[in-house]
Amino acid sequence: MKYLAGDFDVVVIGAGHAGCEAALASARMGCKTLICTMNLDSIALMACNPNIGGTAKGHLVREIDALGGEMGINIDHTFIQSRMLNTSKGPAVHSLRAQADKKRYSERMKHLLEKEENVVLRQLEVIEIDVEDNEVKGVLTKNGAYFTTKAIILCTGTYLKGKIIIGDIIYSSGPSGLYPANDLSQSLLDLGINLRRFKTGTPARINKRSVDFSKMVEQPGDEKIVPFSFIHDKLDKDQISCYLTYTSEETHKIIHENIHRSPLYNGSIEGIGPRYCPSIEDKIVRFPDKDKHQIFIEPEGENTEELYVGGMSSSLPEDVQIKMYRSVPGLENAEILRTAYAIEYDCIDPQQLDLTLEFKNINGLYGAGQFNGSSGYEEAAAQGLVAGINAVLKIKGKDPLILKRSDAYIGVLIDDLVTKGTNEPYRMMTSRAEYRLLLRQDNADLRLTEMGYRIGLVKEDRYNKYLNRKKNVENEIERIKKVQITGKKEINEFLLEKGSTELKKPISLYELIKRPELDYFKVEPLDDKRPNLSDDEKEEINIIAKYEGYINKQLEQVEQFKKYENRLIPKSINYSDIKGLRIEAIQKLEKIKPINIGQASRISGVSPADISVLLIYMERKNREN
């Protein structure tokens, strides 16, 4: 029987990585927040890989942190190994990655929600969204509890009509054998929301005692640990190694012989899977010229023997999986603790959302994470944070937070989903960001902390720390521009020793650093008045000095980009009235409802000629008004 159970400003449905960030942001900005999860023991569950960060994903975590989110702080408290990736490449693609203690990561996030003053945490299944006159009114749970609310954030992950597939065995389930949410999908369909099926998968978990590490290459953590969160100066930890091995000829033979039993190839799987995280059987079919594939053996925590077999997700039958895993060097006697599986789930076409992550046709209803068609913990957390922030800003009658593509990877992520849409689980990559030299992970705080402070998520002590770092970097840049280095004998000897050329005339230290063989760290012996700076401040100064030319070019590109971004399109515009617009362009523009010319220009099916017609129309209307 239905009963009135309470009133909240914001209700968050789901307590995965998106839901946790959404609820914490909402509560910390002063809104009374209910977060519902089907299992209190699966909060911030790492249902797949036991790590946070990685290429482009590390950028997202740093940005979440700079805006006042929790993911970076949580992994700093619960990591078991840390590595900076892509250090042989330029700073734009340097990405931090940390192995997590999965259980501790989840437990700490749960405890944060339990302690947060404005959060009410409940184990409940929401089965219905109540909407009147295109505005949310409340949610109904399976046990009859009805909660009124001003905003609802859907963070359902892979639970909506979840279906696990292992060979020809198919059953209704959420991830890791958890209960699926089978009723909510119908409520969303009744509201006119378009749903579709996506698929993801996870590899087996094996027992550490059954692994022969002597046949693998050890992958230790970095000696110098770099924190994810800008609030942490240094971290110290006894780290646990990962290991690298490869598939064998026998692995490929087993898969080829049993490919007819793969749900991917016999029609059992309807959902579309992630292009950039294919199953092992998909890799072997798609890349027949490769005789081996990398397999990473990753620990799942300090107090467990479970190991994650990275790079080997599968939906093959269990009997095939056992043979397949045991054909990998070092895994000849592997004991499987959890079978690999594929999972299908309902999600939305994100083009139904606007750039605040609110549904265009339902006031107060937001989506975040895998529900929006993305993949990955970090992508989910970023969307959850933005949805939580915007729900509160709307309730308070304030302007929304809309991050541009030139502001953050989060801006690229949301713009791609909402403007371009996605026909497969969307994964963030550095190649998706046009201005990646400006959107480095090292400067996320310098880019976004001001925004986080203005909206009330970044507190005073954190803000003061940011101001101090900003001032130190700016002051040091100014100082080294004034320090003159002359061609003295001992200086030229030093330069020759470093593989550089002699000085013929005085040069500033700032210009000297630009030489390919030198950097801010190497020229320290020439700089006796150098102030005491932190490692991250020194790194920031080095990047700004060495890459100044490239950075300035991208800044010029951003100025051009902003001209289109600042040309706002009136909400009242009727595209059908615009003569010269192609029918496809009219349909796409009416569907997406872009807020500015920049967004309109990125819609698939809208040509540069259509944009010219639209601009001429807007100019004429402006003159008439």
UniProtKB/Swiss-Prot annotation:
Keywords: Cytoplasm, FAD, Flavoprotein, NAD, tRNA processing. GO terms for biological process: tRNA methylation; tRNA wobble uridine modification. GO terms for cellular component: cytosol. GO terms for molecular function: flavin adenine dinucleotide binding. Homodimer. Heterotetramer of two MnmE and two MnmG subunits. NCBIfam families: mnmG_gidA. This is tRNA uridine 5-carboxymethylaminomethyl modification enzyme MnmG. It comes from Clostridium botulinum (strain Loch Maree / Type A3). The lineage of its organism: Bacteria, Bacillati, Bacillota, Clostridia, Eubacteriales.
